[in-house]
Amino acid sequence: MKRIAVIGGGASGLIAACFAAERGSVVVFEKQKKIGRKILVSGNGRCNLSNRVIDAARYHGKNPKFVNNVFARFGPDDTLAFFLSIGIPVVELERGRLYPASLQSSSVVKVFEYELARRGVDVRLHRKIESIKRGNDGFRLTTAGKETHDFDAVILAAGSCAYAPAGASSIGYELAASTGHTVREPFPAILPINIPNKALYRLEGIKWDVGAALEANGRTVARSAGELLFTKYGISGPAALDISRAANENVLARRSPVITIDLFPERSRDELRATLESLWSDANKPIAFSLAGILKERMPEVLCELAGIDPETRIAHAGAAERDRLIATMKDLRLQPGEPRPFAEAVIAAGGVPVDEIDPATMESRIAKGLYITGELLDIDGDTGGFNLQFAWSTGAIAGTAV
């Protein structure tokens, strides 16, 4: 019987093991005390399994169109059918996001535990693989405890270095490199954004619905909309997370990107001006105080400061230039992102093994025959909304079927 190792008990590794069990004797090596640690925290504990609308435009990397070949082999419909077959019906919620009907990540992990046992998969916890050696007859794996195990095929599903609280590390990249693969330098994606602006820090804790964009080299490279959370170091919330990958990529490339925030996306500039002019009818009011009815506490003073206006300036003394600057700040607040925040805070990591080194029909390495690489180890990362888990399910299922 074919001996198959799966390195990593995350999303792609678990589904790979389920399919591979039909083709041989499978052992899953997981360095943590429990499988599915990152699944447990996905979707804020609800497990955003996939998305109703999957296309290459929601993926990034050197060659994002790689996903088209992957999803042609095992796509969202195949994924939903698989989950239904193991007792996890799926429901669709906001923006096409798909979740287990239980709305609990823990139920997904429990079902996988049951399925692996039912299919005869040997799950070995607290087993960190430190080396892969290729030989004439397959692969020899060595654990951190110096145990050695021989296999005919290996599915490398160790995940990225993002989100250390769930046990993430760089070992997957190191193992891939040791077999001859190149690794594009990872960087954190989908996480809060540092903004080196002390005035902005005074808005810590405030949430506000905005339109946001990222500009680099004179063009808009990313857009988002939704809730923005001001923090003690910058910005977070869905509107920030959605542009964080582009922000970090351009910061690291030293392209001096700029984040633009529209605090009133539902109003045109002229409509906002008309609203403000009505609020400025009392010439004796301080200009910051005049905004108290349309902005949350602390926002008027900070926005005035960012616009270069003394918050105590009376309306009567605020000329056209000052008013124009304030309106511009409210409709086009321009912020310079700082260095990326740490991998420990990131949902995913961009970068990884170049996909031109992988056969999308099987996920087998083009460099090391018998080695399969899946999920976030590859140089493909998706937007928030179930796109990354879908890529993990698809690549894992393909590898498990092909091994």
Go through each PLM region and give its residues.
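Beta1/beta-strand and adjacent pyrophosphate-binding region of the FAD-binding site
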Residues: 1-12
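An anion/pyrophosphate-binding glycine-rich loop and adjacent beta-alpha core
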Residues: 33-35, 40-41, 49-56, 89, ...
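Glycine-rich loop(s) and the adjacent beta-strand/alpha-helix scaffold that form part
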Residues: 153-199
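A conserved short coil-to-beta-strand element within the FAD-binding core of flavoproteins
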Residues: 125-138
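A glycine-rich dinucleotide-binding beta-alpha-beta segment and adjacent secondary-structure elements
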Residues: 125, 301-381
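Glycine-rich FAD pyrophosphate-binding loop
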Residues: 5, 21-44
